[in-house]
Amino acid sequence: MTSVHTLPDITATPAWDALRKHHDRIGDTHLRQFFEEDPDRGRELTVTVGDLYIDYSKHRVTRETLRLLVDLARTAKLEERRDQMFAGVHINTSEDRAVLHTALRLPRDAELIVDGRNVVADVHEVLDAMGEFTDRLRSGEWTGATGKRISTVVNIGIGGSDLGPVMVYQALRHYADAGISARFVSNVDPADLIATLADLDPATTLFIVASKTFSTLETLTNATAARRWITDALGDAAVAHHFVAVSTNKRLVDDFGINTDNMFGFWDWVGGRYSVDSAIGLSVMAVIGREAFADFLSGFHIVDRHFQTAPLESNAPVLLGLIGLWYSNFMGAQSRAVLPYSNDLARFAAYLQQLTMESNGKSTRADGSPVTTDTGEIFWGEPGTNGQHAFYQLLHQGTRLVPADFIGFSQPIDDLPTAEGSGSMHDLLMSNFFAQTQVLAFGKTAEEIAAEGTPADIVPHKVMPGNRPSTSILANRLTPSVLGQLIALYEHQVFTEGVIWGIDSFDQWGVELGKTQAKALLPVITADNSPAPQSDSSTDALVRRYRSERGRTS
């Protein structure tokens, strides 16, 4: 059943108007004043979910702001929409699909009937098949064509079939315990595949081809080249020993030469950017094992249950989504920095870029009408402390408002002492975490700088205005469960914002036209004869120059 969101324009509601007037009153208030007037703010404007301690006190909001934002969420019927998603209602209206990434992490004894099927049973059937396969791979029972054990799995996919597995593998690679490593190929640029395979042995390499339809151009182009690399070294019969598929298209998988017994499926109610906890995560399970992967899924479920049951006033994803909307629609912010103080989360910001920007980068509401306010936050970031020596200057003293999410851990996976002997390198890392959130919020005044004896002409250059907002997310250690909790925390923020904006956060029509046009242009740039003129003079000139530099008739 399709559920069409028919709410009126949210920007024309009393709840929106109340927030606008509230912003007029408090929008310029400094965080210093908020903390002076409310000394307990730093302890009270926090929420704990699972293993995540979330401090949102350094945001330019008051308790009244939060109350008004929750009123806005209720006006948009967020709770009703959330319940529809968890129940399997077709809330992806443009594609008439349920949205059930949350079902991927339901426990085995749960039941969820959607379109006449218990999807939980289907999910665990695939998880069991993945587990049996990875057990064979990790034990050495599964071998390559020459009888050697597999030591490297190469995931070939793009978009959600790549960004999620890459990020999770890097974050959890310390949990590898069976002598298997993973690599990832996504770009159709041949340099990607060539560099990945350069030092690998075909006899000990297994490819996972991840494509729901098994027809994604970039993925199949890379997979075909990888198959040629295997067959040139080991013969045609080796394909069945060195390739498995994550797909739903048995015919094309079989045509490729992969035994369909080694095909792991997923469903149209799982969007690519929400799929790392499905069979798309097979490369991760192969490295960390089925038990650690189950812990990963359990982390998602912890936050799912919180999002589903906690009152909006204390619901972490809802509050963070509402605060993001406050900055986007009332404070003029356009982007959010994601700053993990963990090198293991180096790819987390890139992962969130797809999750958030492909979901909420929309200019049309679910009912087909144009939006009446800005939508979609631009996500970007790098791990600390690297970012401090790159772009934090703009965060501290620039003219743009950039709310930031700081993510850190009390216990490192590995640690080393500092040369000075005062704590460890991890302590040094986290001292920067705490210092940056503090300085962003409170800054340093001209009077304070002058009092240090700074020359008068230098004082203006050293003023740190502060009032730069941030969220601090602190967990004990980066474990599979904690990573699942972090991902789900952001998934449900995306949902919260999308519901209030009235958009469909689960389609991505904006990526389709470019792919179609690329297919049309490929024969134009490769044909032997001179091509017909393109519809615009810029593309025509570019194509002709490219053809000329490739030695083709222009």
Curated annotation (Swiss-Prot):
Compositionally biased spans, kind Basic and acidic residues: 542-554
Biological source species: Mycobacterium avium (strain 104)
The protein, known as: Glucose-6-phosphate isomerase
Pathway as given in its UniProt record: Carbohydrate biosynthesis; gluconeogenesis; Carbohydrate degradation; glycolysis; D-glyceraldehyde 3-phosphate and glycerone phosphate from D-glucose: step 2/4
Family (UniProt): Belongs to the GPI family.
Alphabetic keyword roster: Cytoplasm, Gluconeogenesis, Glycolysis, Isomerase
Coiled coil (residue ranges): none
Enzyme class: isomerase
Ranges where the record places region Disordered: 527-554
Annotated InterPro entries: G6P_Isomerase (IPR001672), G6P_Isomerase_C (IPR023096), Phosphoglucose_isomerase_CS (IPR018189), SIS_dom_sf (IPR046348), SIS_PGI_1 (IPR035476), SIS_PGI_2 (IPR035482)
Signal peptide location: none
Compositionally skewed regions (Polar residues) per UniProt: 527-540
GO cellular component, one term: cytosol
Listed GO MF terms: carbohydrate derivative binding; glucose-6-phosphate isomerase activity; monosaccharide binding
Its EC number(s): 5.3.1.9
Catalytic site: E358, H389, K515
Reaction it catalyzes: alpha-D-glucose 6-phosphate = beta-D-fructose 6-phosphate
Function: Catalyzes the reversible isomerization of glucose-6-phosphate to fructose-6-phosphate.
GO biological process: gluconeogenesis; glucose 6-phosphate metabolic process; glycolytic process
Localization per record: Cytoplasm
